[in-house]
Amino acid sequence: MNKLVKTLLLVGTHGVAVGGGFALGIYLLPILTAPESPAVEVVRSTADVAQYKGEFRRDLADSDALHWGEGDLFIGPNSIAFEGRLAPGPDYRLYLSPKFIETEADFEANKSEMVQVGHVRTFENFMVAVPESVDPAKFTTAIVWCEAFGQFITAASYQ
C-alpha cells in the first residue's frame, strides 16, 4: 500500500470515529444531564384537576424513530403534566397552538400564533408550569419542539 492510500484510510477512519462520537454525544448528553422525572403520583395529582386531556402519539406525520412521544397529557389551569415517554434530545420546549400541528413545516408556518409555555427537561413524565399570561383554553394543541435542531417531536390535541 502506498503512503497516500494509508494516509487517506487513516484520516477516513478517524473522521468516522470522531463524527460517530460527536453524534453519540449529542444523543446521550441530554439523557445524562436530565433531572429526575416527576413521580407518577405528582403527575396524576395534576391529572385529577386537569381541565383538558390529550394524547401524544408516535404515528404523526413528522414523528420518526428519533423524534417521538407517547403518553397522556393533562392540562390544568396552573400546570401541564405528561405521563409517558419522549425520545431524548436537547432543548425541548412545550408550545400551545390554536390548531393541530404535526409537521415541521406547519410548525414554522404557524409559530407566530403559538405560545411557548416552557422547557421540557425530562424524557419520562414531565411537569411544566403554565405562566399567568397563558390561558390554555385559548388553544387546542400542545406541541413538543426541539428548539436546538428545529425538529418536530410530537403533538396532542386537547380540545
Each predicted region: which residue ranges?
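Hydrophobic membrane-insertion alpha-helices, especially the h-region
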Residues: 6-26
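Transition segment at domain starts
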Residues: 27-76, 106-112
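Solvent-exposed coil/turn segments that connect beta secondary-structure elements
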Residues: 78, 85-87, 97-100, 147-149
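Beta-strand signatures of extracellular beta-sandwich domains
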Residues: 93-95
